[in-house]
């Protein structure tokens, strides 16, 4: 129902249930572990990102949650970038911005996300991360993600039904 877990009583005191913005560097260890696996496996997407996974990107933060608060990881239906979540709230349509997916989640428009095998090598609990907790239509920058819902139109003082584009970093 799009409710962030931090809004639920059982997760109110759990830091990993809250938003982890780009500047969050708590997942340095997870980024290093993921990078070591990517290098050892010769992941072809890694050089596209400068040969090093950053703790500021999506998967190290998700992995940090899995390692330190597995109950949060298990309870989360979705993990997403803040911009994609805002667009979801505005339109009621879950989409992913190609900009965010490409930059923060190693998505390639022809090859997709990194393989299940990569994620399984990182941690068996991550094997199905894409299919289970990320999968949604990916839309290009400036592409229509949906239309503004009536409730959001009232809240924002805009017209219901106007087109809403994907987010951009």
What are these regions (language model features)?
Residues 1-169:
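Glycine-rich phosphate-binding/catalytic subdomain of phosphoryl-transfer
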């Amino acid at each position: 129902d799009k409710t962030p877990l931090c809004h639920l009583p059982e997760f109110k005191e759990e830091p990993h249930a809250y938003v982890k913005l780009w500047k969050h560097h708590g997942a340095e260890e997870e980024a290093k572990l993921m990078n070591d696996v990517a290098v050892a496996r010769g992941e072809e997407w890694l050089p596209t990102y400068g040969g090093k996974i950053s703790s500021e990107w999506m998967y190290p933060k998700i992995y940090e949650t899995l390692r330190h608060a597995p109950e949060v990881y298990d309870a989360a239906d979705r993990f997403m970038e803040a911009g994609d979540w805002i667009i979801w709230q505005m339109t009621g349509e879950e989409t992913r911005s190609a900009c965010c997916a490409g930059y923060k989640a190693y998505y390639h428009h022809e090859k997709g996300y990194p393989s299940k095998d990569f994620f399984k090598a990182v941690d068996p609990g991550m094997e199905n991360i894409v299919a289970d907790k990320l999968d949604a239509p990916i839309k290009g920058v400036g592409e229509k993600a949906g239309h503004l819902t009536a409730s959001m139109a009232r809240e924002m003082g805009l017209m219901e039904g106007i087109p809403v584009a994907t987010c951009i970093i």
